[in-house]
Swiss-Prot record:
PROSITE patterns: TRANSKETOLASE_1 (PS00801), TRANSKETOLASE_2 (PS00802). Pathway: Metabolic intermediate biosynthesis; 1-deoxy-D-xylulose 5-phosphate biosynthesis; 1-deoxy-D-xylulose 5-phosphate from D-glyceraldehyde 3-phosphate and pyruvate: step 1/1. One of its GO terms (molecular function) is thiamine pyrophosphate binding. The gene is dxs. It comes from the Bacteria. It is an enzyme of class 2 (transferase). Catalyzes the acyloin condensation reaction between C atoms 2 and 3 of pyruvate and glyceraldehyde 3-phosphate to yield 1-deoxy-D-xylulose-5-phosphate (DXP). GO terms for cellular component: cytosol. NCBIfam families: dxs, PRK05444.2-2. Homodimer. Its EC number is 2.2.1.7. This is 1-deoxy-D-xylulose-5-phosphate synthase. Mg(2+) binds at residues 142, 171. Keywords: Isoprene biosynthesis, Magnesium, Metal-binding, Thiamine biosynthesis, Thiamine pyrophosphate, Transferase.
Length: 618
């Protein structure tokens, strides 16, 4: 196989050669991720599995489907991207996830968890209809099996018996480690040809026996299966092989050969170590899952920690403060306790905070039930993952107007994770739902007040959003004030045009305001605060101004400017309104500042756009 300037011979019979390939791949992953940041530990842990897959299968005839795909770095290196891997997660460089537009070897876009088996079932159905050779091969992590879509796909797969290989990469994040010699012996038995042949023959024999005898024989087989791993999968009609050592290339190759011959759905349970090959990261799951640039020798971050709290920290600190005084506060997250800041609250009040795993729909529905019972559930969730729970928001929270509180983290452009993780949709779909209150803070201090308002709001569901990393508005520029339902805040009154900011858009609008002032153009500045309900006095507030310019980190369609235009139209008020929201396309990965500049959302571009609209030149 040609890797641009590298040539590797992936001979499945040359285990020593494959091990050298694995070491080369690990070295390259460490070299690049230490410089760029990325998903390190999962990618290091999956190297042997991916090398084994490529050694035995042509991935263009047997599509490789990577669940979430943050573990697919070795796959990228083995498919012509060894040299360009240095651009990983950089603006206009390689994506940190599989991306068909980047390479024909990347079968499917990925970034969210638990979709691989469902995709594989779809591929298998299509292959059967086309009478195509080959079968899909899905590599998924053990965390992925907590989501409902995984079981929905297994249900059909076990019933239809489509040929498909699933490799369950168990790095001890969710699945218990088998214990003792019996488990090891049964594993060797189950992955061997004797066991598979035995199972096949027993099934054939049982099918020929009279019903009375068949019942006793079936009970014998059930007893045999109960002492083996993987009973659950076998009961669904999925062949189970394992556990195997996911770093033992001999075991991987032999197991994949067996799975290939079965021509049925097979799940291979492979145990791996996250961070394999980098001692500092081995076994330290949370710290080394997603990392920024770091020193390869010491493991220390190359970026010094900011003295200013991140929005996530400001949120979680405030929630902890409130939780100490209010026993009705409960916290819910979907497999992201650290990312959403709930880890410290779980430590303080473990009985009142719930990590429901990768189950966003369940998070929202169960939270709605807790709200009905008088509790105050704060559902802490990334914007990109909230969209997976849309029906639960509508059906279970909003129809009954149950006062759940949606704390929407990573709202707006998120940077290096790209299309699958941008937090740009929540504004548009949430504002369309009756009974939903939607608001946004402009900085850390108003975020703290937003949490306090949400805690007291008890008449309906509410949602507030905040960005990744930091707000655009520096702390202390404007005095913080509390939230009052449906009230905006006019931060600067003087001017002929009005800049309207929503959430993080206030900071962007303020920077433009300062730039225009240097051009002797005075602008008023409004912090919209509430998107739903809008300030009932909005028509009076905007009346003195000739033009309105709207700034917000969300899609333009169905966004903040749309809401303002709808409101003014109902009041029979005609005002020129220009939106500086996100254009109607999926936004690529890269440094946030570079991405914003490419979209014309940096201060210089925004200032020029307003000057042009006003008929002036810079």
């Amino acid at each position: 196989m040609i890797l641009q300037n590298k040539t590797f011979d992936l001979n499945p019979n040359d285990i020593a050669g494959l091990e050298l390939v694995c070491q080369t791949l690990r070295n390259r992953i460490l070299e690049v991720v230490s410089a760029n940041g990325g998903h390190l530990s999962s990618s290091l842990g999956a190297v042997e599995l991916i090398v084994g897959m490529h050694a035995l299968f042509d991935c263009q005839k047997n599509p490789f489907i990577f669940d979430t795909s943050h573990q697919a770095y070795a796959h990228k290196l083995l498919t012509g991207r060894f040299e360009s891997f240095s651009t990983l997660r950089q603006f206009k460089g390689l994506s940190g996830f599989t991306k068909p537009s980047e390479s024909a070897y990347d079968y499917f876009i990925a970034g969210h968890s638990s979709t691989s088996v469902s995709i594989g079932v779809g591929v298998a159905k299509a292959f059967c209809l086309k009478q195509a050779l080959g079968m899909p091969i899905a590599l998924l992590g053990d965390g992925s099996i907590s989501a409902g879509i995984f079981y929905e796909a297994l249900n059909e797969l076990g019933d239809r018996k489509y040929p498909m290989i699933m490799i369950l990469n168990d790095n001890e994040m969710s699945i218990s480690t088998p214990i003792g010699a019996l488990s090891k012996a049964l594993s060797q038995l189950m992955k061997g040809p004797f066991y598979q042949s035995f199972r096949s023959k027993v099934k054939k024999i049982l099918s020929t026996l009279p019903e009375s005898v068949n019942y006793l024989a079936s009970r014998f087989e059930e007893s045999f299966k109960l002492i083996t791993p993987g009973v659950f999968f076998e009961e669904l009609g999925i062949n189970y092989i394992g556990p195997i050592n996911g770093h033992d290339l001999s075991a991987i190759i032999e197991t994949l050969k067996l799975a290939k011959e079965l021509k049925e759905p097979v799940l291979i349970h492979a145990q791996t170590l996250k961070g394999k090959g980098y001692k500092i990261a081995e076994g330290r799951y949370e710290k080394w899952h997603g990392v920024g640039p770091f020193d390869l020798d010491t493991g220390l971050s190359k970026k010094s920690k900011s003295a200013i709290l991140s929005p996530t920290e400001a949120y979680s600190n405030t929630l902890l403060e409130l939780a100490k005084k209010d026993e009705k506060i409960v916290g819910v997250t979907a497999a992201m306790p650290s990312g959403t800041g709930l880890d410290k609250l779980i430590d303080a009040y473990p009985l009142r905070f719930f990590d429901v795993a990768i189950a966003e729909q369940h998070a929202l529905t169960s939270s709605s039930a807790m709200a009905k019972e008088g509790f105050k559930p704060f559902v802490s969730i990334y914007s990109t993952f909230l969209q997976r729970a849309y029906d639960s928001i509508v059906h279970d929270a909003c129809i009954s107007s149950l006062p759940i509180k949606l704390a929407i983290d990573r709202a707006g452009i998120v940077g290096e994770d790209g299309e699958t993780h941008q937090g740009l949709l929540d504004v548009s779909y949430l504002r369309s739902i009756p009974n939903m209150v939607i608001f946004a803070p402009r900085d850390n201090e108003t975020l703290k007040n937003a949490v306090r308002f949400a805690n007291e709001h008890d008449s309906s569901p509410c949602a507030f959003r905040y960005p990744r990393g930091s707000f655009a508005l520096k702390e202390g520029v404007f005095e913080p004030s509390g939230f009052v339902l449906g009230q905006s805040e006019l931060l600067k009154k003087e001017g002929e045009i009005l800049l309207i900011g929503y959430g993080n858009g206030v900071g962007r609008a303020h920077l433009v305001q300062l730039a225009l002032k240097e051009k002797n153009i005075e602008c008023a500045l409004l912090d919209l605060r509430f998107l739903k309900p809008l300030d009932p006095n909005l028509s009076a507030i905007v009346a003195p101004y000739q033009k309105l310019y709207v700034f917000s980190d969300n899609y333009k369609l169905g966004g903040v400017a749309s809401a303002i235009l709808e409101f003014l139209s109902e009041q029979n008020i005609l005002k020129p309104v220009k939106s500086f929201e996100i254009i109607d396309e999926f936004i690529m990965h890269g440094n946030t500042a570079l991405v914003e500049k490419s979209l014309g959302l940096d201060t210089e571009s925004l200032t020029d756009a307003i000057l042009k609209d006003l008929g002036q030149e810079r």
